[in-house]
Amino acid sequence: MSRELLYSEETIAARVQALAKTIARAPLLPDIAMPILVGGFIFAGDLVRALAREGVELEIEMLWLRSYGDKRVASAISMIAGPSEQIAGRHVLVIDGVLDFGRTINKAVSLIEAAGAASVQVAVALDKQRPDAVAKADYVAFEGGNDFVIGYGMDDAGKFRALPYIGKVV
């Protein structure tokens, strides 16, 4: 199985810092970050540190949703760990690796709103820009492509998640 580079480690780092600057200048700042596990954890770690460098220090609460299991075809979304009562009245920044059809992000936003968040914004490392997506991201590091992506937290049946770049399997 060969891999093709889409975005290098250096390109990702520069883009994450630029995205943090954009978020830090927004009129409504988040006060809590909520990464979607497992795919969003690496991007989330980089983004919250970049935000701290911009003077935006966020509390962190994890949300663990699963939609792919061990295959490439999305299945029903299951919640492993949901939002806590600590997000009630808070401005939440949901962070995920990829926005494909948007089902996972849509579920996350619904759960967070139901838990009483004052506002919910979404940041993703890669937005595939699908016209049929059921969710939208407020902040996007990279756009486009319909490839099945790997690396930087995103996997193929549990493999390739720890790669320091975003690539695709060819």
Ranges and model annotations:
Residues M1-V170:
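PRPP-associated nucleotide enzymes
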